[in-house]
A protein has these predicted regions:
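Glycine/small-residue-rich loop that forms an oxyanion/phosphate-binding "nest" at active or ligand-binding sites
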Residues: 92-135
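Positively charged, low-complexity intrinsically disordered leader regions
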Residues: 1-27
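Periplasmic-binding protein-like
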Residues: 85-93
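Short beta-strand elements in bilobed, periplasmic/extracellular small-molecule ligand-binding domains
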Residues: 53-67, 177-181
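Glycine-rich phosphate/diphosphate-binding loop of Rossmann-like nucleotide-binding domains
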Residues: 38-50, 96, 128-195
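Short, ordered loop/turn segments at secondary-structure junctions
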Residues: 36-38, 65-67, 93-95, 106, ...
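Short beta-strand segments enriched in small/hydrophobic residues
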Residues: 28-38
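Short, well-structured alpha-helical segments in soluble
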Residues: 73-84
């Protein structure tokens, strides 16, 4: 049976909770977002992040860089931000030649949870930074009264950003869903999704 989740209502609840938590901190958290190039979708995502950060009291700094930046310059910036910021996001997509910089972010500063150490912890069921979208999906499930324990969940897509981390989170002890991970080569996808 289908159930529509009121994501806006839940987001507002979470925002209220975060605002309260941040207000109790002696120093507000500092987050830097690094954008490379002029992708319109990236600009839109960053604007939404900046607005949300402002509403809860997080200090966000946007570093907008040319797509012509070289890896050495980018690594220097990331090294500097690793020392001064509480969190760091490299807004994707970025040129393939610069992707190695994601491993340069200190795992504890890796807000997106893309660093191989954080993904490795996720595989092992060890606490660490988790990719935001999968973590948000789990939070939505629980807050909407949809406990996945013992249920069969079909995840469509196996990206390292959403699908694979989500399937790992769902199957961890404490969440305990049975997961089928479908992808572009899955036969009869519609049959899996109807289950």
């Amino acid at each position: 049976m289908s159930k529509i989740i009121d994501g806006k209502k839940i987001a507002k609840e979470i925002e209220t909770e975060l605002t309260s938590q941040v207000s109790l901190m002696s120093v507000p958290p500092k987050l830097s977002v690094v954008q490379i190039g002029d992708d319109p979708a990236s600009a839109s995502y960053i604007k939404a992040k900046a607005n949300a950060a402002s509403r809860v009291g997080i200090k966000l700094t946007h570093h907008h860089l040319s797509k012509e930046i070289n890896i050495n310059e980018l690594e220097k910036l990331v090294d500097k931000l690793n020392k001064t910021e509480d969190g760091l996001i490299i807004q994707l997509p970025i040129p393939k030649s610069l992707e190695s910089v994601l491993e340069r972010i200190k795992p504890e500063n890796d807000v997106d949870g893309f660093h191989s150490e954080n993904l490795g912890k996720l595989v092992q069921g060890i606490h660490g930074m988790v990719p935001c979208t999968p973590a948000g999906i789990i939070e939505l499930l629980y807050r909407s009264g949809n406990d996945p324990e013992g249920k069969h969940v079909v995840v469509v897509g196996r990206s390292t950003i959403v699908g694979t981390p989500l399937s790992l989170l769902l199957s961890q002890k404490g969440v305990d869903a049975t997961v089928t991970l479908c992808h572009s080569r899955t036969k009869s996808l519609h049959e899996h999704c109807k289950q």
